[in-house]
Amino acid sequence: MKKSKGLHELYNKDPITADKFVWGRESDPISRRGFLRKAGLASMSLALGSSIPFAKNFPAGMIPAAFSQSYDPFQLYGKDDLILLNDRPFNAETPAHLLDDNVTPASRLFVRNNGIPPVESQIDPKKWMIHITGESCMNKTTLSLEELKTKFKHHTMQLQLECGGNGRSEFTPPARGNQWSTGAIGCPEWTGVRIKDVLEYVGVKEDALYVAYEGGDRHLSGDSRKKPISRGVPIWKAIKDESLIVWEMNGMPLPLIHGAPVRMICSGWPASVSGKWLNKILIRNIVHDGEKMNGQSYRVPCEPVKPGSKVDDKDMCIIESMPVKSLITFPKSGVMHNKNSKLKIRGHAWAGDSRVKELFCSYDFGATWKKAKLDRPINTHAWQHWEHDVEFPQSGYYEIWARAVDDIGRSQPVVLPQWNPRGYLNNACHRIAVSVKI
């Protein structure tokens, strides 16, 4: 008996061959469009339950959005709507349509852990201490959380956090790590103090290069001598006005799972630099060499490589600013819509350390694009909201694609960006399926 294979398994192995096997589809190596013969078009239309008006524009090696996500339900207290990826360490993401809020609720912010969080019963905010040290720290100091709150000016900002591996599940061949879809992103409101104010208080030597953190989480092995993660940012990033040490999220005390009682926020970079359960700040005179700073972690090849290649550690570069990206949050993928009315779509866009300048939408697989209404960010490093009305020419199967362009002209790619071994920085256009009926 032949082994059966799922659609995703076939496409992960060889998307072009899968196209031909599943749909009888031939691909143009130059345009990257797929040509469906009559039988293949009928097969895909039957599977989708509708005709495909712009089938000729559909990119090669791409699974239709209607089939691109399938989830088994799994509930966790306070995170009922998240999709579980693994449970040790606990990591979970939010489906795109549940990220529709302008300000992300705590219950819908993705969770990414590298170790075991501290036990809530053992955390007393009144006794929590933050040690500030390192080769480039002039006056090594220990501050209580209460002192942090009383010695420095408070700031409240809406700042986005995105996992460096958001979108990893779309890479072919598959990349190692949690198979995030599109939901490892959020933009809550945070309250705390600026890192630069704390650094000025303790004094920083002229040779300072990096600011790093350590947290109260434990290594998965249980070995107290090992740190599950200790990352950092260059000093210039740490002293930006938007780089904070925070204790509130959306006006409430930080939830334990999001770093209570206090954490760092260095928005626009991989969320792994925004350390949770903060108990130590290190001012370094070298590029920080803590856990998850070296090797392949949160690094990409310094030069483009062939998909599936093995890359030496010495040829990997640290990820800094995240790329331009967008998300469709309304409607939910798979929506049924009446042709006689316009479909209102909306979502968010962001661009690491930059700002999104324009947002475009397409309903014909990228053949044409229409400019959407794009709001300005409420503050630097907050995501931007956009909306657009779509009018369909006829009934059938459609996909809405969203493409953001940042303020220096960098645009989201229609298909997957450059492959890398760990599946970081996927900023391909987000898309949803729409069935239009008369």
Please place each PLM-identified region on the residue numbering.
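Structured, non-membrane catalytic/scaffold regions adjacent to prosthetic-group chemistry
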Residues: 61-438
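Contiguous N-terminal and early-domain "leader" segments and peripheral loops that mark the onset or edge
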Residues: 1-2, 41, 132, 139
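Acidic/proline-rich low-complexity IDRs
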Residues: 6-9, 47, 57, 81, ...
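N-terminal export signals
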Residues: 34-60
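N-terminal accessory segment at the very beginning of proteins
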Residues: 15-20, 24, 40-43, 87-98
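Intrinsic disorder/low-complexity segments
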Residues: 28, 40-42, 65
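Short alpha-helical segments used as structural interaction elements across diverse proteins
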Residues: 29-30, 34-35, 109, 400
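N-terminal secretory signal peptides
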Residues: 1-34, 56-58
